[in-house]
Amino acid sequence: MDASTLFTRLETATASFRNLERQLADPDVAADPKRLESIARERSRLEPLVLDFEELQRLESERDSARQLLKDSRGDAAMEELAQDELASLQEQHATLTERLTLALLPRDPRDERSVMLEIRAGAGGDEACLWAGDLARMYERYSQKVGWAVQSISCTEADLGGFRELILSVRGDSVYSQLKFEAGVHRVQRVPATESQGRVHTSTATVAVMPEADAVEVQLDPKDLDISTARSGGAGGQNVNKVETAVDLLHKPTGIRVFCTQERSQLQNRERALEILRAKLLEREQAAAAERESSDRRAQVGSGDRSEKIRTYNYKDNRTTDHRLGRNFTLEPVLEGQLEDLIGACIAEEQRQKLEALSDQAEA
């Protein structure tokens, strides 16, 4: 991105920021909580950009003064050296800030700010795959807790020997999708299962889908397309187990998508959860189809989000996690403990690099 384009975009962002501040002072906006929250969120997103732009302008002014001082210092060796040092420092600060602002202005995925439904399904490997799905769930729960996101299991099918055949987690917080979107795909594990008596390494898989939450306005459901039935929730015993039909089995007839919810205490709550999951699945399907139509774009991304894409291998013997999109290895144990910062940060950096490359290609075209 050349300096002129960068400056123009920063001026536009600053104008938007000032407009949002005026709107926040409007009594009509203050009386509408949903609109107020939306405007406040966008203002918070733009504020660091505006402050950095002001700092960039200050640096440019000081840099011009340093250049003039250097010009005026010809013949005075001591003053000339001071001016050169000052100019070098200002140029370094300017370059660093320019790079940061360029990255901040890269095209944003409008879904990045959203909370998500995280679906984990056991793949190849039988009982070991179910155990692996459970390990992945714990990994994401630990990471989410570390960064301050709220995690709740909203649908699960437990396996006989532990773990899950299928699990859906609701992960809510700031910019959840912007980080967890890189987790979509096939996660492969290579280890000796607890049930293996001869010490042989087995390979198992689990598939992760990351679905941004969708609201009722965004994905409208026709009641005629829904087949909703209830069932008795299973449990470990107790007075109410298998006596009250609180579980909800939801079928979306046009797509065949089925959602079964048992985690909430009441039938109404399970019904609402099932509808949330269905909306997220339908939105994911719609956006995946749109991305497929723009296949050249999709293939260039760090991860296409395709459920069938093998993104990572976890090798217990070598204590190594390999991210195949990055071609990089990470230490296994911290990753499984939810220390995903370096791994996700590397994915974000690669995505930014690819976006910068695409902008450069467009500029040259």
UniProtKB/Swiss-Prot annotation:
Alphabetical list of Gene3D superfamilies matching this protein: 3.30.160.20, 3.30.70.1660, 6.10.140.1950
SUPFAM superfamilies tied to this protein: Release factor (SSF75620)
GO molecular function: translation release factor activity, codon specific
Location within or outside the cell: Cytoplasm
UniProt keyword annotations, A-Z: Cytoplasm, Methylation, Protein biosynthesis
InterPro entries listed in its UniProt record: PCRF (IPR005139), Pep_chain_release_fac_I (IPR000352), Pep_chain_release_fac_I_sf (IPR045853), Prokaryotic/Mito_RF (IPR050057), RF-1 (IPR004373)
Function: Peptide chain release factor 1 directs the termination of translation in response to the peptide chain termination codons UAG and UAA.
Protein name per Swiss-Prot or TrEMBL: Peptide chain release factor 1
Organism: Synechococcus sp. (strain CC9605)
Lineage, uppermost ranks: Bacteria, Bacillati, Cyanobacteriota, Cyanophyceae, Synechococcales
Gene: prfA
